[in-house]
């Protein structure tokens, strides 16, 4: 193509050395040169187009190391059941009812975003509550964590869920005082409502794979892609890929609609299939690539299913839950490591994190790989001594700062004072661990600048602050966590995450310099343009 462009006229943050430059020269989809305007003009040639930033800030496109894009698109199409509009049970029922009134007579009503701590009743809705919306059709609301679904009586009946239905391995059917199902399904129990042809996660993770028509799933994925790109996110890791996601990504790519760069971690139910295929390392292209294996150790802090042998504040005998017996999880991680795969294991509670660290240690004793880059997804509540072990083993924690903004107050209620160590970024930095930040969208929104603000301030939705100054990180450290460190966590640092010659020209233009504005104004910094492959994104073709 020989498309040559020079971008200049505002602060340019490279996330590499030197940290700031005057200009960037692009050749087609790649960065040709960074440095002075004179040098970039010389590198690009006299016929190069020149783009004036007009004082705005240029930096690398954001890299979100933990997302669920198809789930984001699907949940965005459902009823938004989160604050500030929904803070009471009556408001939830009323809003779901409005959606019901606009649907065909038997179409299901789905919602997303409920958290018990946000409702006036301080509990999750149960079947009797959702029966107020409808009894002649399915009504279902996914918990904000993605690890639970609340359903009405019709959904329970349609799927044969009764008092005699046992809890599946890795899941739980909440029951009332008589033993009947209450209508709240956790983790692998969501398998029970995805139908005979739907994805089954078994005891390998929460079932976020709600069925829909294939062509509809492509549209939902493309809608999510637009949301991410408009937030300045150009590369993501999809942290739970099954055949549903794979088929949808392939369809979007084949239709020429995939602009986002996606690294896929396939769910551990597929480990033996990967071994049988011999798929031991990265496979794909610059926009869609297989990256490794996703596993689950425990549940979620927001759903009170994260695993702590010491229990929770409200009940020291309530420990949360594990998806696998410890030896089974360690075996899966050892097998994936021996085969050559990078793993990302969901672990929130310190007791679950201990199982993962032991598994990685055993795997390295078996086959020494110095650059394994095994990850712990979320890694919200490691014990203080585990931080050093994480550094020693070379494990990468992948955190989501917006989570402590959304649910930090509820965590203090559930865990007590130890919740102030949630997402211990300061401890990570002092141990030599570079923070990797992400959104886990749709659990939180896809806005990286809100996440940066949350990581720097540790402020919650209700205005309290988690931890002291020692747990905070700088704006620059947080920005690196959403660019070059996010790229490194998914083995893409050779291609994205910083402005360096030879890398892909994925750029974001911001209204202001995030390193110069007051910290309290970080969330107000706007993404004004997103570039992929050396040109502004053409949203009309997506």
Task: Report the location of each language-model feature.
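Divalent metal-binding segments
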Residues: 2-8, 13-276, 295, 300-335, ...
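Non-cysteine beta-strand/loop elements that form the S-adenosyl-L-methionine
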Residues: 68, 287-305, 395-404
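Short glycine-rich, flexible loops that bind phosphorylated cofactors or substrates
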Residues: 118, 158, 405-406, 517
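His/Asp/Glu-enriched, well-ordered alpha-helical/loop segment
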Residues: 205, 333-344, 348-374, 378-379, ...
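Acidic (Asp/Glu)-rich catalytic clusters
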Residues: 253-255, 279-288, 369, 390-392
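Short proline/glycine-enriched turn/loop segments at secondary-structure junctions
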Residues: 281-282, 517-522
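Short peripheral tails and domain-boundary helices/loops at the edges of structured domains
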Residues: 527-542
């Amino acid at each position: 193509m020989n498309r040559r462009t020079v971008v200049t006229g505002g602060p340019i943050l490279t996330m590499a050395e030197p940290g700031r430059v005057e200009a960037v020269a692009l050749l087609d989809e790649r960065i040709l040169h960074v440095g002075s305007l004179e040098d970039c003009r010389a590198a690009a040639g006299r016929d190069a187009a020149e783009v004036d930033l007009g004082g705005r800030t240029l930096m690398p496109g954001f890299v979100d190391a933990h997302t669920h894009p198809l789930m984001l698109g699907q949940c965005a199409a459902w009823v938004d059941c989160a604050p500030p509009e929904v803070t009471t049970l009556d408001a939830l029922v009323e809003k779901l009812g409005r959606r019901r009134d606009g649907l065909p007579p038997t179409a299901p009503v789905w919602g997303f975003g409920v958290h018990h701590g946000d409702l006036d009743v301080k509990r999750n809705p149960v079947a009797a509550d959702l029966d107020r919306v409808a009894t002649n059709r399915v009504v279902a609301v996914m918990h904000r964590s993605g690890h639970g679904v609340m359903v009405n009586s019709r959904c329970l009946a349609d799927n044969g869920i009764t008092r005699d239905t046992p809890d599946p391995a890795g899941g739980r059917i909440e029951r009332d005082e008589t033993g009947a199902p209450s209508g709240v399904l956790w983790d692998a129990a969501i398998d029970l409502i995805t139908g005979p042809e739907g994805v089954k996660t078994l005891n390998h993770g929460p079932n976020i794979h709600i069925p829909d028509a294939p062509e509809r799933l492509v549209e939902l994925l493309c809608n999510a892609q637009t949301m991410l790109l408009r937030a300045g996110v150009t590369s993501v890791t999809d942290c739970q890929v099954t055949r549903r996601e794979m088929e949808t990504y392939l369809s979007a790519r084949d239709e020429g609609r995939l602009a986002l760069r996606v690294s896929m971690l396939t769910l551990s139910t597929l480990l033996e299939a990967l071994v049988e295929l011999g798929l031991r390392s990265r496979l794909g292209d610059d926009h869609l690539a297989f990256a490794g294996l996703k596993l689950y150790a425990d549940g979620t802090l927001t759903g009170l299913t994260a695993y702590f042998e010491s229990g929770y504040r409200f009940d020291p005998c309530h420990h949360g839950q594990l998806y696998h017996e410890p030896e089974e999880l360690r075996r899966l991680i050892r097998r994936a490591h021996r085969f050559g795969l990078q793993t990302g294991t969901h672990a929130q509670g310190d007791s679950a994190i201990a199982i993962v660290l032991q598994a990685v240690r055993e795997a390295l004793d078996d086959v020494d790989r110095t650059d394994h880059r095994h990850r712990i997804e979320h890694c919200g509540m490691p014990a203080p001594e585990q931080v050093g072990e994480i550094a020693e083993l070379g494990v990468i924690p992948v955190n989501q700062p917006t989570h402590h903004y959304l649910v930090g107050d509820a965590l203090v209620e559930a865990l007590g004072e130890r919740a102030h160590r949630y997402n211990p970024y300061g401890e990570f930095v002092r141990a030599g661990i570079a923070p990797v930040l992400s959104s886990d969208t749709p659990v939180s929104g896809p806005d990286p600048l809100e996440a940066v603000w949350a990581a720097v301030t540790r402020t919650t939705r209700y205005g309290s602050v988690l931890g002291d100054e020692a747990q905070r990180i700088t704006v620059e450290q947080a920005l690196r966590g959403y660019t070059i460190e996010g790229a490194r966590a998914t083995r893409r640092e050779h291609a994205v995450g910083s402005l360096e010659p030879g890398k892909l020209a994925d750029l974001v233009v911001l209204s202001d310099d995030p390193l110069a504005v007051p910290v309290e104004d970080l969330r107000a910094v706007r993404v004004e343009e997103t570039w992929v492959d050396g040109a502004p994104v053409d949203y009309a073709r997506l």
